[in-house]
UniProtKB/Swiss-Prot annotation:
GO terms for cellular component: cytoplasm; ribosome. One of its GO terms (biological process) is rRNA processing. The gene is rimM. Disulfide bonds: none annotated. Binds ribosomal protein uS19. This is Ribosome maturation factor RimM. It comes from Psychrobacter cryohalolentis (strain ATCC BAA-1226 / DSM 17306 / VKM B-2378 / K5).
Length: 177
């Protein structure tokens, strides 16, 4: 068994959801572009109250509009019931470099968001998918324009420029939205 990696070297790739059936299967929410691509990335780590623990997929399949999986560490539904909400992580250095103008969500979290009027709207605290497109949750800071939380679509018409070196995202998003 490999030793637990440093948490700062990890990237979140998904989350376990409610149990499916009686044999320890769980619904899996994937944060990968192709939701089944999550199963091509190994090894997985799960974040628990006692630290990072390995999680090994025994089997998986598409089920309706989602995906379910069975794990070596989860023998039955009773254990599966305790796993709802557990986050899934991989070591970032095993992932390929993103293509030009593509980003891993974990690289975007904590970036400062500025609009075209040069107003500081806040920092990205979360990226999530709605089905139509990804959304940036932008939280106010002590230095931001106001105390409003904003949900800004991650879309080519909205995101003007990303500068990972300067840790900023420029958006076409007026402050009164």
């Amino acid at each position: 068994m490999s030793s637990a990696p440093n948490a700062s070297a990890l990237m979140k790739i998904g989350q376990l959801k409610k149990p499916y059936g009686i044999k320890g299967w769980l619904w899996v929410f994937s944060e990968t572009d192709d939701r089944t691509a999550i199963f091509d990335i190994k090894p997985w780590w799960m974040k628990t109250a006692t630290g990072m623990k390995p999680l090994t997929v025994k089997a998986w399949r598409e089920q309706g509009t989602g995906i379910v999986a069975q794990f070596e560490q989860i023998p039955d539904r009773n254990v599966a019931e305790t796993m709802n909400g557990v986050t899934l992580w991989v070591e970032q250095d095993i992932l390929p470099e993103p293509a030009e103008d593509e980003y891993y969500w974990s690289d975007l979290v904590s970036l400062r968001v500025m609009n075209e009027q040069d107003e500081y709207l806040g920092d990205i605290t979360e990226m999530f998918e709605t089905g139509a497109h990804a959304i940036m949750r932008v939280a106010a800071t002590t230095d931001s324009l106001d105390k409003e939380e904003r949900l800004i679509p991650w879309h080519k018409q909205t995101v003007v420029k990303v500068d990972l070196t300067e840790k900023t995202v420029l958006v076409a998003w007026p402050s009164d939205y």
